[in-house]
C-alpha cells in the first residue's frame, strides 16, 4: 500500500501547521520507481531543521546516484501531524513517493545532535517498526545511523541495528551495491546485517572488534555528489546554498568534537568549488551561498577566492557568507568583500574570556583584535556583533568566577565599540573522542547560577543575552558520555511522551526529570563526574583514528599555557590520523584562478513580465510566503537578469495579485517580475516550467517594457485586484442543506452585490468581488458549513482573478494585460 491509498490524508494536511513539511515535490528531489533497494534518509527533526542539514543533502545525492537505489526522505512530524496520523491509523511515510516506512529496506538516520534520540524513536514507531533492534524481524527495515552525534554508540545501541562511523562518500556505494546483490539472490535481513557487521567502520552491539572511522581521503580533489537539492519548499532554518570548501580544521581546539571527527584538514580544489557554486546559483537558484567549513578563514586563498567570487557573480545578486571565522583570520579585506551584496552576521566564538583560559583550549581570541575588527566593521555598516561563550570549561583554577570574567569582557568590548551585542552562553558538555572527554560537567544548578549572574549583570545595557537550557546540556551529557543504560532511559522517556526535546514549545523536561529520578543508578553523578585518563570509557571500542596518548597529552597541557601548533602537512603532533592513505591537504597558495568569463552585459532596459500560473497537486499546501520564495529561486534558475531593489538586502521586484488560501487549487494565479532586457513570452514560459517544483506550472506570459508601464501609469497587481471566480465541488452529505445555508449567509450578510453563485449538479460557480471582508471564500464556507476545515466537504478551484483598471471596469487580468 502506498500512502496515496489513504483517502483522508489531504484533509489531515489541511488541519495542521505547515502542511508542506509532509508533501515533498520540491525542485531537485528524486522520484525513482522499481529499484531493488528502497531506503529513506532522515535527519530526525522537523522539516525546516532537517532540510538545513548538509550531511542529509550529501547522503541523499550519494544514495540516489547509486544504480538500483531509491532513497527518499522522512523527517520528524510536529505534534499536530503526529496526533492526526495516529488517530487515523496512517503510518509515517516518505516524502518523494509516499512509501510507508515499514515497507522500506533500510532507514538511515544522520545524527548531528544527541538530543534527537526521541525523534528517532517517534519516526520508527510511527512507521510501525519496533523500537528496539532485538525486537525487529525479517519483515522490518534495517535501521542504521551515522554522524557526529553517535560516535559514542552505546546510548543508542538498543535502537539501531548498526551504526556507521565516519565519512560516507567512499564507503556507502560499494556497501549498498553488496546489499543489492544480497537482495537479488534472495538473502534475508539478517544477511544484510551480517554484511554491515563485517565492515571495519560499522558498529553493532554484538561486534567484538574495534571500529575504525571511515575517512574519505579524496575529499577536495574528486567530484562527488554535493550538498545541492532538494530545494526546500518552505523556508528552512538555513535557507541558503552550501559549498563545503574544507573538511576538518587546523586549529585543534581541545573541546571540539567536530575538529576530531573531520580530521585531518583537507582543502577543496578551486575548480570544484567554482563548479558547485555554479550549480547552486544557476541550477538551483540560490542567491546566498555559505562557504562551509569549521574555520573558513583558514582556507589557504580565502581573500583571493572571495574577491573572485564577488566579481564573477555580482550581476546575479549573489552574496557569500562564512559560518565561522577565527579572530586571527578576520581581515578588513574580508569584511569589505562580505559587504559587496549583503551583510552576513559578525560572529565571534570566544568561548572563554581570559588569555590563560583560551590557552587551555588551544585557542586565541584577544579582546584587542576583536575590538579592532568591530570598529572596522562599523565603518562598513555592521550594527550588530554576536558572541558565543561557554561556562564550565575545564580551565586553569577551575574557572573560578568565570561568569564575572565574561561580564567584564563584554562590557569592555561594548565600551570600546558601542555596537549592539548579542551574547549566547552555553554550558560546556564534554564530548567523546576529544582531549576534554575526561572533564567534569556542571550540574544544572551550577549552570543556572552562573547564567543568572551574567544575565542580571548585563541588564540595562544594549546587550541581548540568550542561553542554552542548562537541563538540555545536562541531558546532552548523558548521551554524549553515557553507556548502554542511557538507552533504557531514552526509550522510557519516549514512551512517556517526550518528543522534539530541543524545542522549547514541545519539550517535556518535567517528564525527563521524572525518568532520571526513577533510574536505578546515580545519573547525576555519571553525567557530571570527571573521568580518569586510565578509566575504561564506553566509546573505547570506536577509533576516530587518533591515538589515546594524544588525547591524554592534550589533556595534561591544561594549566601549562602550552599551545599545540596548527595541523599542517609537516606538523609533528603524532596524533595518529595522518598516514599513507590520509593526510593534511592544503591547496597551492600560488594557484592561478581560471580567467573570469566575459561578463554578459546587463541590459540597462527593464521589462516587466506578467505571468499566469497554475497551483495544483503538492503545491496547494504551500503558504503564500513560501510560494514567493519558490518563485524567486525558480526565476533565478531561468538565467534571466532579475531587477533587484536597492538597499541593505536587495530583493527581486516580484509581485503577486492576491494570496491564495491553503488547500485551494488554482488554474490562473497572477504574478509579475521585473527583468533586465526583454524576452519572448514563450521563452519565459518554457524556461520557468523547467525550473518549478511539482504542482506549479506557468501557462501564459505577457512582456511589457518599463517605458510602457511607466507611461501608462500601470498600478500594482494587488491594487488592481477586484475579486476571483471559483468552482466548488461539494462532497458533503446533503447538498440541499448546503445550498440553503449558503443563500442564507449571503442574504443575512448583505453580500448579494459581492457574491454571485450558480449551481450545476454538485458544483457551484462563484464570482466573488473584492470590497467586503465577509465576501471571502474560506471565511464564508467556515460559517456555512460550521467547521474550521471546510475543505473536508468540498474541493475548490480558483479559475480566474479579476481586476479593475478603471472605475466600473472589471475584467480578467489576462484580458487587461492584452490591452497594455
Language-model segments: which ranges?
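Canonical Radical SAM [4Fe-4S] cluster-binding loop centered on the CxxxCxxC motif
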Residues: 235-271, 574-587
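Flexible glycine/acidic-rich beta-alpha junction loops that bind and position SAM and/or redox cofactors
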Residues: 79-80, 155, 300, 330-334, ...
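N-terminal [4Fe-4S]-dependent radical SAM core
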Residues: 10-40, 47-48, 198-242, 544-558
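Core RNA-modification/binding signature centered on pseudouridine synthases
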Residues: 605-606, 621, 627, 732, ...
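Glycine-rich beta-alpha loop elements in corrinoid/cobalamin-binding modules
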Residues: 77-210, 435-483, 490-506
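Conserved SAM/AdoMet-binding glycine-rich loop
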Residues: 41-46, 279-425
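Radical SAM enzyme core and accessory elements
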Residues: 2-28, 39-41, 460-600
Amino acid at each position: 500500500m502506498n500512502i496515496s491509498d489513504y483517502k483522508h490524508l489531504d484533509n489531515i494536511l489541511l488541519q495542521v501547521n505547515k502542511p508542506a513539511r509532509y508533501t515533498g515535490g520540491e525542485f531537485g528531489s528524486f522520484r525513482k520507481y522499481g529499484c531493488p533497494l528502497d531506503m529513506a534518509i532522515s535527519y530526525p527533526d522537523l522539516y525546516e531543521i532537517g532540510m538545513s542539514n548538509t550531511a542529509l543533502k550529501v547522503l541523499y545525492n550519494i544514495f540516489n546516484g547509486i544504480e538500483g537505489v531509491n532513497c527518499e526522505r522522512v523527517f520528524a512530524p510536529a505534534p499536530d501531524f503526529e496526533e492526526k496520523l495516529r488517530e487515523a491509523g496512517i503510518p509515517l511515510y516518505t516524502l518523494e513517493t509516499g512509501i510507508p516506512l515499514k515497507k522500506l529496506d533500510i532507514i538511515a538516520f544522520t545524527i548531528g545532535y544527541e538530543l534527537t534520540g526521541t525523534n528517532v524513536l517517534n519516526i520508527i514507531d510511527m512507521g510501525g517498526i519496533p523500537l528496539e533492534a532485538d525486537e525487529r524481524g525479517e519483515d522490518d527495515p534495517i535501521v542504521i545511523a551515522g554522524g557526529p552525534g553517535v560516535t559514542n554508540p552505546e546510548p543508542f545501541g538498543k535502537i539501531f541495528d548498526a551504526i556507521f562511523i565516519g565519512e560516507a562518500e567512499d564507503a556507502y556505494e560499494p556497501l549498498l551495491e553488496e546489499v543489492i546483490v544480497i537482495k537479488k539472490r534472495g538473502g534475508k535481513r539478517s544477511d544484510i546485517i551480517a554484511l554491515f557487521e563485517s565492515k571495519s567502520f560499522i558498529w553493532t552491539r554484538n561486534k567484538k572488534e574495534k571500529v575504525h572511522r571511515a575517512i574519505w581521503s579524496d575529499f577536495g580533489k574528486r567530484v562527488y555528489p554535493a550538498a545541492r537539492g532538494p530545494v526546500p519548499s518552505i523556508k528552512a532554518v538555513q535557507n541558503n546554498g552550501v559549498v563545503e570548501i574544507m573538511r576538518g580544521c587546523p586549529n585543534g581546539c581541545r573541546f571540539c568534537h567536530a575538529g576530531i571527527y573531520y580530521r585531518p584538514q583537507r582543502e577543496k580544489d578551486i575548480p570544484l568549488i567554482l563548479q558547485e557554486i555554479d550549480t547552486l546559483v544557476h541550477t538551483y537558484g540560490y542567491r546566498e551561498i555559505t562557504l562551509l567549513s569549521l574555520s573558513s578563514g583558514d582556507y589557504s586563498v580565502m581573500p583571493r577566492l572571495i574577491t573572485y567570487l564577488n566579481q564573477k557573480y555580482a550581476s546575479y545578486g549573489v552574496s557569500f557568507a562564512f559560518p565561522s571565522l577565527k579572530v586571527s583570520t578576520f581581515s578588513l579585506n574580508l569584511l569589505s568583500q562580505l559587504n559587496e551584496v549583503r551583510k552576513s552576521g559578525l560572529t565571534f566564538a570566544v568561548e572563554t574570556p581570559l588569555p590563560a583560559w583560551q590557552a587551555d583550549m588551544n585557542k586565541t581570541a584577544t579582546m584587542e583584535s576583536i575590538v579592532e575588527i568591530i570598529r572596522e566593521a562599523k565603518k562598513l555598516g555592521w550594527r550588530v556583533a554576536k558572541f558565543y561563550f561557554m561556562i564550565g570549561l575545564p580551565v586553569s583554577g577551575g574557572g573560578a568566577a568565570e561568569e564575572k570574567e565574561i561580564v567584564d569582557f563584554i562590557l569592555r568590548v561594548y565600551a570600546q565599540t558601542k555596537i549592539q551585542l548579542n551574547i549566547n552562553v552555553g554550558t560546556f558538555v564534554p564530548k567523546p573522542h576529544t582531549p576534554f572527554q575526561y572533564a567534569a560537567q556542571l550540574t544544572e544548578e551550577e549552570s543556572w547560577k552562573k547564567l543568572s549572574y551574567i544575565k542580571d549583570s548585563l541588564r540595562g545595557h544594549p546587550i541581548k543575552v540568550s542561553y542554552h537550557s542548562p537541563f538540555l546540556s545536562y541531558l546532552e551529557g548523558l548521551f554524549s558520555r553515557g553507556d548502554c543504560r542511557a538507552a533504557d532511559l531514552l526509550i522510557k522517556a519516549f514512551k512517556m511522551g517526550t518528543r522534539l526535546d530541543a524545542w522549547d514549545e514541545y519539550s517535556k523536561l518535567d517528564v525527563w526529570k521524572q525518568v532520571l529520578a526513577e533510574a536505578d543508578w546515580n545519573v547525576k553523578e555519571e553525567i557530571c563526574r570527571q573521568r580518569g585518563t586510565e578509566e575504561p570509557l564506553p566509546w573505547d571500542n570506536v577509533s576516530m583514528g587518533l591515538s589515546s596518548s594524544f588525547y591524554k597529552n592534550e589533556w595534561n597541557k591544561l594549566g601549562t599555557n602550552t599551545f599545540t601548533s596548527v595541523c599542517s602537512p609537516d606538523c609533528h603532533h603524532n596524533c595518529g590520523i595522518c598516514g599513507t592513505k590520509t593526510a593534511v591537504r592544503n591547496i597551492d597558495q600560488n594557484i592561478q584562478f581560471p580567467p573570469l568569463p566575459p561578463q554578459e552585459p546587463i541590459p540597462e532596459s527593464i521589462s516587466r513580465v506578467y505571468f499566469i500560473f497554475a497551483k495544483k497537486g503538492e503545491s496547494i499546501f504551500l503558504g503564500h510566503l513560501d510560494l514567493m520564495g519558490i518563485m524567486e529561486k525558480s526565476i533565478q534558475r531561468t538565467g534571466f537578469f532579475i531587477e533587484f531593489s536597492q538597499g541593505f538586502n536587495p530583493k527581486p521586484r516580484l509581485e503577486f495579485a492576491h494570496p491564495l488560501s491553503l488547500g485551494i487549487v488554482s488554474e490562473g494565479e497572477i504574478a509579475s517580475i521585473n527583468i533586465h532586457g526583454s524576452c519572448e513570452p514563450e521563452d519565459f514560459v518554457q524556461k520557468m516550467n523547467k525550473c518549478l517544483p511539482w504542482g506549479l506550472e506557468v501557462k501564459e506570459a505577457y512582456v511589457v517594457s518599463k517605458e510602457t508601464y511607466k507611461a501608462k501609469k500601470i498600478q500594482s497587481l494587488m491594487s488592481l485586484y477586484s475579486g476571483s471566480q471559483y468552482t466548488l465541488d461539494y462532497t458533503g452529505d446533503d447538498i440541499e442543506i448546503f445550498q440553503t445555508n449558503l443563500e442564507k449567509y449571503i442574504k443575512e450578510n448583505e453580500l448579494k452585490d459581492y457574491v454571485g453563485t450558480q449551481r450545476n449538479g454538485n458544483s457551484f460557480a462563484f464570482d466573488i468581488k473584492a470590497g467586503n471582508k465577509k465576501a471571502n471564500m474560506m471565511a464564508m464556507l467556515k460559517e456555512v458549513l460550521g467547521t474550521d476545515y471546510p475543505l473536508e466537504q468540498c474541493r475548490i478551484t480558483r479559475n480566474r482573478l479579476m481586476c479593475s483598471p478603471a472605475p466600473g471596469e472589471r475584467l480578467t487580468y489576462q484580458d487587461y494585460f492584452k490591452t497594455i
